[in-house]
Design a protein with these regions (language model features):
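Domain-level signal for soluble alpha/beta catalytic cores
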Residues: 1-121
């Protein structure tokens, strides 16, 4: 998981992603998940700059947020169609695999599928 309050490309424990660059060598894909859907494009772009061109990126945003007092809170604050529009932005930023993480539903994935069908025509 990447930290949304830190600069782009920083894990929750404060470790910058670039410190893992050598570990990515030979990977078929590297994924980012459990990041708020609206902020994921920037993270995908950052990761894309760290990877070889033949490495796919998986992007799985969430619908919810972390609360320091009660922990994780799922929310339906992002409608499936809006989430799908974010997923298209992740693709534009370099993701080749998109899906959903915490708080997403089958309706969310269906909306992504529909948007991808529209885009491909």
């Amino acid at each position: 998981c990447l930290c949304e309050q830190e600069p782009v490309g920083v894990l929750l424990d404060g470790t910058p992603l670039h410190t893992f660059s050598d570990s990515f060598k030979g990977a078929r894909f590297v994924g980012i998940n459990c990041v708020a859907a609206p902020t994921l494009s920037e993270q995908v772009s950052h990761l894309n700059n760290l990877l070889d061109d033949d490495v796919d990126i998986a992007a799985y945003g969430n619908v919810g947020y972390a609360d320091s007092k009660v922990g994780w809170i799922n929310t339906d604050a992002i409608e499936p169609e809006r989430y799908a529009s974010y997923a298209l932005q992740w693709i534009d930023s370099g993701a080749t695999i998109v899906g959903g993480c915490c708080g997403t539903t089958p309706e969310t994935i269906s909306a992504i599928h529909q948007q991808l069908k529209i885009r491909s025509t």
